[in-house]
């Protein structure tokens, strides 16, 4: 979706916002940087809006027919599922969980698609900080890892106390403010712990523990994934078993590294870590 189309879409709900650029995108939607201008002070502020497009295929209609469900009811159930996931995030009260400023769902009249719009603070993903920190000293890398650990562990504490697993902890889902604070975001695939949906089909296997292969995992999966993120921060932004920086990484290297980790090979010490850490 281009910026002009996006502007037309959100003007129905948030006429004070103007989409300025695309911040990033992936499987679960596109994030747009937006601006709003205070009518009294004329001060311009930044916000972000994530747009998730949910497409409905002929197979969806066939599945609804097989189950004896009117497609309109099926469509509304999918809509409610997405909105409930956002409500979970809104209900999680932590200074280190991305704050939701508003959300809505916009339906296509023919039920061919559904747009979920989430309005939030404009932040920078941790993986976008890589160029500025790739050549950090061990002391600088340790300081960054410690700050990320403290902030995101606080966010996970609140999640797990409320029975919510994030299930996709990775640098792209850890966000940084201009003041250097970190926030946990992108709960688009979070589930209540009782639901235990497949992590391998939703999360990022690069940061997942071995237990996801059997589906036998709990809140500790989030902690493990965060641990791998922290490992990379003190290993020149590379995961375990990959070639040492600055040697180029091939797809084969990544496959071998993942195989070693999933088979329980002890992790080598990170190469940019202080002795104290």
Sequence positions of predicted segments:
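Catalytic-loop of the protein kinase fold
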Residues: 160-176
């Amino acid at each position: 979706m281009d910026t002009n189309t996006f502007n037309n879409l959100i003007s129905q709900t948030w006429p004070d916002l103007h989409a300025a650029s695309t911040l990033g995108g992936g499987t679960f939607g596109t994030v747009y940087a937006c601006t709003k201008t205070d009518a009294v002070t004329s001060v311009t502020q930044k916000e972000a809006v994530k747009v998730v497009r949910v497409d409905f295929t002929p197979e969806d209609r066939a599945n609804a027919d097989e189950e004896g469900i009117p497609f309109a009811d099926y469509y509304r159930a999918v809509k409610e599922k997405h909105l409930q996931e956002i409500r979970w995030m809104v209900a999680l009260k932590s200074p280190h969980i991305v704050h939701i400023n508003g959300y809505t769902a916009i339906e296509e009249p023919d039920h061919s698609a559904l747009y979920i719009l989430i309005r939030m603070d404009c932040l920078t993903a941790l993986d976008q900080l890589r160029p500025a920190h790739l050549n950090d000293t061990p002391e600088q890398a340790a300081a960054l890892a410690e700050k990320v650990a403290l902030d995101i562990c606080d966010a996970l504490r609140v999640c797990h106390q409320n029975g919510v697993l994030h299930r996709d902890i990775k640098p792209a889902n850890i966000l940084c403010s201009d003041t250097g604070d970190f926030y946990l975001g992108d709960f688009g695939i979070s589930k209540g712990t009782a639901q235990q949906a497949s992590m391998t089909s939703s999360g990022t296997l690069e940061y997942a523990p071995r237990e996801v292969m059997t589906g036998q995992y709990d809140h500790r999966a989030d902690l493990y994934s965060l641990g791998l993120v922290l490992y990379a921060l003190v290993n020149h932004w590379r995961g375990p078993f990959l070639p040492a920086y600055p040697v180029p990484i091939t797809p084969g290297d990544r496959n071998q590294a993942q195989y070693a980790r999933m088979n329980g090979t002890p992790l080598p010490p990170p190469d940019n870590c202080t002795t104290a850490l």
